[in-house]
UniProtKB/Swiss-Prot annotation:
Gene that this sequence comes from: HMGB11
Lineage, opening ranks: Eukaryota, Viridiplantae, Streptophyta, Embryophyta, Tracheophyta
Record feature DNA-binding region, as residue ranges: 215-282
Biological role: Binds preferentially DNA with A/T-rich content.
Name of the protein in its database record: Putative high mobility group B protein 11
SUPFAM superfamilies associated with the record: ARID-like (SSF46774), HMG-box (SSF47095)
Key word Phosphoprotein present: no
Record keywords: DNA-binding, Nucleus, Transcription, Transcription regulation
Length: 337
């Protein structure tokens, strides 16, 4: 019996139709997942269990992260890779309206998505076979690394860099300003430094002491031991230039426990000193901020018209000055190495 060759020609047509049916089914399934939270959770749990992965909902801000919401927010913007490329992570974060401040929230959500949803996205959103997931995962890692380097470069501003900012208020010595660096919003103070101020700076510092600097951190018993040994070595070699030995660690190790107790006690006393001074320092800083805010409010109410006129001219103006920030904690070396 002869066979009509046309019988063989319907196979690719049927295969193509089958592919279309599968694609259409997966597309409908994704829409169902987006609309139906219960279906989403059921499928996500089954997906992880079938892959022998631990199914544990991340905790963010003290609450369980809504993975369904996260999946919808990311895929509605084209998937995780596109969100990172288009720098839209903040949009996703803002959609959650976290009541508490989440440290490095972009990293936390991205990590949660990678662990719980990225492979799920690959299968149900992009409708791609799991056999190709490793390629997408590798590409995303390179993108994240590139994005991190780009953000780092964009935020490393050198002294003298011109930035655009907004003047929020005015006080006796300068302005309260805000600016945006990358995706981060910053607030600070812009000071007028007159020649008289510069000349009197040294004198003022001697009269005020180091009240504007944070106190030195608590020293350890080992710190006290090294300081004592350095003094002893310099005294024994008076008149000679002697560098401190680098084997203080061995000397400390060879001390008996009873000998170390002397230095531990000094460290405890220094801890009391630090706690007292840090409280005083914080109180001083809070008072200074309150004074600046009060002066700003008073100046604004006294000369509202003048301030509004100046602000309208200077808002969004490019400045070539450096903003003053709170003093960073300074730790001085106890011993010259």
């Amino acid at each position: 019996m002869s066979t009509d060759s046309s019988q063989f020609e319907v196979v690719p047509a049927n295969a193509s139709a089958l592919d279309n049916d599968v694609s259409s089914h997966m597309s409908m399934l994704y829409q169902d997942i987006v609309r139906n939270p219960e279906l989403f959770w059921e499928m996500l749990r089954d997906f992880h269990e079938s892959s022998d992965k631990k199914f544990k909902i991340p905790i963010v801000g003290g609450k369980s992260l809504d993975l369904h919401r996260l999946f919808n927010e990311v895929t509605s913007r084209g998937g995780l890779e596109k969100v990172i490329k288009d720098r839209r992570c903040k949009e996703v974060i803002d959609a959650f309206n976290f009541k508490t401040t989440i440290t490095n929230s972009a990293f936390v959500l991205r990590k949660s998505y990678l662990k719980m949803l990225f492979e799920f996205e690959h299968l149900y959103y992009f409708q791609a076979p799991l056999s190709t997931f490793w390629e997408k995962e590798k590409a995303l890692k390179l993108l994240i690394e590139k994005s991190a380097n780009r953000d780092k470069d964009s935020q490393e501003l050198k002294p003298g860099t011109v930035i655009t900012g907004i003047i929020d208020g005015k006080f006796e010595s300068g302005y309260l300003i805000s600016t945006k660096v990358g995706s981060e919003k910053l607030k600070g103070m812009l000071y007028h430094i007159s020649p008289e101020t510069k000349r009197g700076k040294k004198k003022a510092k001697s009269s005020q002491g180091d009240s504007h600097k944070p106190p030195k951190r608590q020293r350890t018993g080992y710190n006290f031991f090294v300081a004592e040994q350095s003094v002893r070595i310099k005294a024994e070699n008076a008149g000679q230039k002697v560098s401190s030995p680098k084997n203080f660690g061995n000397m400390w190790t060879n001390l008996s426990e009873s000998d170390r107790k002397v230095y531990y006690e000094k460290s405890r006393e220094d801890g009391k000193r630090y706690k007292m001074e840090i409280l005083q320092y914080r109180s001083l800083m809070e008072s200074r901020v309150a004074e600046i805010v009060a002066a700003t409010d008073a100046g604004t109410s006294a000369s509202a018209a003048e301030t509004a006129d100046e602000a309208s001219q200077e808002n969004l103006a490019k400045t070539d000055a450096c903003t003053s920030a709170s003093s960073a904690a300074e730790t001085e070396d106890e011993v010259s190495q």
